[in-house]
Amino acid sequence: MKKIIVSIVLLLALCLNMFAMASCTKEEKKTDFVIPETGFDTSTPVTITFYHTMGQNLRDVLDRYIVEFNKLYPNITVNHEQVGGYDDVRDQIKTEIAVGAQPNIAYCYPDHVALYNLAKATISLDSLIASDTVVTRADGSTETLGLTQDQINDFIKGYYDEGKSYGDDKMYTLPLSKSTEVLYYNKSAFDNWAKLYAETGDEKYNVKVPTTWDELEETCKKIKALDPDCIPLGYDSESNWFITMCEQMNSPYTSATGDHFLFDNETNRNFVKKFREWYQKGYVTTQEISGGYTSSLFTKAETEEGNSYMSIGSSAGATHQRPVKGEDGYPFEVGIATVPQVDVNNRKVISQGPSLCIFGKSDSQEVLASWLFVKFLTTNVDFQAEFSMVSGYIPVIKSVNDHEIYKNQFLNRADGGDNITALSVKVGLEQEDAYYVSPAFNGSSAARDEVGRLVQKCFTATTTDIDGMIKKAFEEAVAECEYQAG
């Protein structure tokens, strides 16, 4: 599920006047929220608005937990609205900021928040997180307004740290639910090859599920020899592939401060050249090159030309990686593993999926009510468990692993057939130490788009001067990023 990000140059052209207007509204724009000495007033009614992208099934879950939240805070009315997809949320909010009509809370990706921060529309959460103010709830219980250290530690670190990816060491978001990339593979085929290898000792059947890129190359080579008409691997996102390689190789990609676009370097040019060779050998294709999600190749029958045996795609799209079930069951079982690594002892996988940001308001009680609701959704084990089971996204707190229903009725039933969603989430939870997020700034979405186009261009170019072509492609990508960022 790939985000379609509009060109930042057009977006900024549309928004330039918007931000000038926003800076002149009655509400003074400050990102650092100051908690009033009186704290949160539980006796005065307050209404907050939440923009998201949830379908009906997830809205039903949200509604149930708003009821639970209101048992604690009956004075807070939560109005929530589905606003299309992620980019639709961003586009509507950037328009509303101009007249001070933005919501209180919104689904967000880091590049969205970087845009909102141009108008200082979102607040930093640091003072709220650190607050030791005590709030008395309607049932007589109390809670600390801020996050306890145990609550902070419960977040999957890579997900939590996304909130500080803006270059100023301030926290602007909390994670709600996440996805990542995983390696889907035809487990039935791999098991059959393993059986043949055990029976014959023929090395051509020694085909292993790869854990490193070097192993992946060898696996692709052997699969191509066994099935010359196949494309062993499909990789959905060229952008994710490039960015993940930068992270795994500790090679510069972008920076939130100073010179932003750092990806034109020898290390990065070399891995693009290597993967171009894979493409030229017929080992791999991508979504843009193949003309659609590579799951369509992965779910093909092995007898069909152009089928694949591996696919790297979103963990949240697991059901799309499963072949159609027939009268005799599924044509093959799907296995799921962590994407290949440069160093298996220092794994890096991309973190994606929605976080929550809070917008500044002249009424501090709206901000406090918004914070209490965000805190409730992100730290409530029951909500995180149910939301994950319904959505197929990964919960953001580790304690969900100990939730009895989640563990016994979801994770423990994980398989590569009917329960493939649970298997995908399970793999996502097992790699909790590996998540990374890229720096967010004005132009970060342009960088993402351009490196994806760069990969596509370098893979498909017909030239004898490969190094020269790749060098030019990198230079043009950086130039386009700088142009779009202004």
List each language-model region with its residue ranges.
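Mature extracytoplasmic/periplasmic domains
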Residues: 61, 68, 316-325, 342, ...
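Extracytoplasmic/periplasmic substrate-binding proteins
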Residues: 53, 63-66, 115, 239-251, ...
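Short, low-complexity disordered leader/linker segments with a strong preference
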Residues: 1-48, 71, 475-486
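Hinge/lid segment of periplasmic solute-binding proteins
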Residues: 35-36, 90, 111-182, 245-246, ...
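Extracytoplasmic "Venus flytrap"/periplasmic binding protein-like
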Residues: 68-154, 192-193, 302, 309-310, ...
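Short, well-ordered beta-strand elements
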Residues: 44-55, 76-81, 105
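Conserved C-terminal helix/tail region of periplasmic/extracytoplasmic solute-binding proteins
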Residues: 367, 414-416, 424-486
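Helix-loop-helix "hinge/cap" segment bordering the ligand-binding cleft or interdomain interface
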Residues: 71, 128-133, 137, 147-155, ...
